[in-house]
Every structure is written in C-alpha cells, then in structure tokens.
C-alpha cells in the first residue's frame, strides 16, 4: 500500500541536542532533538533511538529507546519524552557515543 511505502521510505534522522535534568529518581525523562516545525515535527510524533555500534569493523545500529514529541520549541528544536530506554540513552549520550533518532512513520499519520 502507499502508506506502507511512505512509512518505509521517507523516514528522517536527527540528533539529540541535550538531555533535560534527571527526575528525583535520577532518570532522564525528557530531552531535546534537532528537528522542529521546519521538518514537520508536531506533538505526539514518535522517534526510535539507535546507538551506532561497530561489529566486526562494520557500523551497525542497535535500538536503545523511543521518544514521543511533547512540544515543538521552534523550527529546529523539539522537546521529547523518553518513553523507553531512559538509562541507555542517558548513558550513551553522556559517554559521547553516537545516537541517531529516526522518525517512526506510524506517528506521522501514514
């Protein structure tokens, strides 16, 4: 179907800009990504978070978490709730390891 084709072929990637301060239990619940209204991002949109990991000399991606957009701050920045993988995302980001956020077409109405 057309919806399946769009979901599979028109994803976009972005980066995590900054983590919000942790909650009272030390968990990072929100963060900022480098995509906003300019890319059509709106509240409720979903992103999968992957860590780039070398395996046998080849860069691969391993899923570490999921985000839901809470608020679009401006054309270039959105604030997201971490819905899965808060410890993994915080650890990788803090260590400077490569994290990539990939749009999840299911949330974009496709």
Predicted feature residues:
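Surface-exposed, polar/charged interaction patches used for macromolecular assembly or partner binding
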Residues: 1-110
């Amino acid at each position: 179907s057309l919806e399946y084709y769009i979901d599979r072929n028109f994803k976009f990637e972005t980066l995590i800009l900054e983590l919000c301060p942790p909650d009272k239990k030390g968990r990072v619940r929100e963060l900022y990504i480098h995509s906003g209204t300019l890319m059509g991002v709106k509240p409720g949109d979903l992103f999968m978070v992957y860590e780039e990991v070398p395996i046998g000399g080849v860069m691969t991606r391993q899923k570490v978490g999921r985000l839901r957009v809470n608020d679009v701050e401006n054309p270039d920045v959105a604030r997201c709730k971490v819905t899965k993988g808060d410890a993994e995302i915080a650890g990788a980001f803090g260590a400077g390891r490569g994290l990539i956020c990939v749009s999840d077409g299911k949330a974009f109405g496709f």
